[in-house]
A protein has these predicted regions:
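Non-catalytic, surface beta->alpha helical segment in thiol-disulfide oxidoreductase systems
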Residues: 59-86
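Thiol-based oxidoreductase modules, predominantly thioredoxin-like and allied folds used
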Residues: 7, 30-44
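Conserved coupling/switch loop of ABC ATPases
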Residues: 14, 56, 62
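Local sequence-structure signature of Cys/Sec-based thiol-disulfide redox active-site neighborhoods
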Residues: 1-28
Length: 86
């Protein structure tokens, strides 16, 4: 099963921009497990992920193994392509 962990923050402009794109992809791929984490509010869950300073971060898991990370703002098409090609 594919799981996408999205780490973002309410103060992050790029994260706010990506929120609508995330929603569209969540609707398109409902069989994927989507997990939204806030960099500040969920720090105990985010810290072990070592996401760095560039957010949003998308961590893609396949069968509970991390297979890819992508970070930053991008078009919906680019994000979808990145999420599909792991």
């Amino acid at each position: 099963m594919r799981k996408i962990v999205i780490v973002s923050a309410v103060w992050c402009h790029a994260c706010l921009t990506m929120r609508k794109r995330n929603k569209a992809l969540k609707d398109k791929y409902p069989d994927w497990q989507w997990v939204d984490l806030d960099l500040d509010l969920d720090d105990e869950l985010v810290e072990p992920l070592k996401v760095g300073k560039l957010i949003p971060v998308y961590i893609i898991y396949e069968n509970d193994l991390e297979v890819k990370r992508i970070a930053g703002e991008m078009s919906q098409d680019a994000l979808e392509s990145e999420l599909l090609h792991v």
